[in-house]
Amino acid sequence: MQRNPYILRVKRYGNEKNPKLVILLCNPGDDPIKYERLPDYIMYLKGEYKDAGLSLDVGCRYNDWWDDFFNVFKQVNLKPSDVLVLEYYPYHTCDMSLIPNYNQWTDYAKNALSENKKLLSKFMYKNIPVFGYYYSHWIREVPQLKDYKLFYKSRARFKNHKIKELHQFLQEVL
């Protein structure tokens, strides 16, 4: 595999057909130049990597970032297979401030966002709860989120506080 930051991309994880929860993220983190350290790279080596449709159960085996989410899911009797996670930008960056302007995106990235916006709108229409872990980009792209009654905008800065917000939100809506 050559050093190309655009190889290991992630559109979304989880249940694309009938989720009980949608989580909005900004993009996969970590340094794309050091792709050997990415959980996606290990999945790639083991033949389990997918840019979309990857089960959260599989993703969690390779990335402990999800452990806190899984603990919350268990506490509210939500299966990981009931969750859909949408990425705004499908490429890894060290920081979300490094996401380029939309006019500099690849066609793949533009198509991924378009697909994810359609999925989000579809599930909002079906009154599925949406948790905005990172949501500011999403509100610009899907303005009806602002008035969606089952949308929670995380105001916390740190992950452990965001996880507490997720737990409280799920207790209220599930």
Residues covered by each model-derived region:
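C-terminal capping/extension of enzyme domains
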Residues: 102-117, 136-174
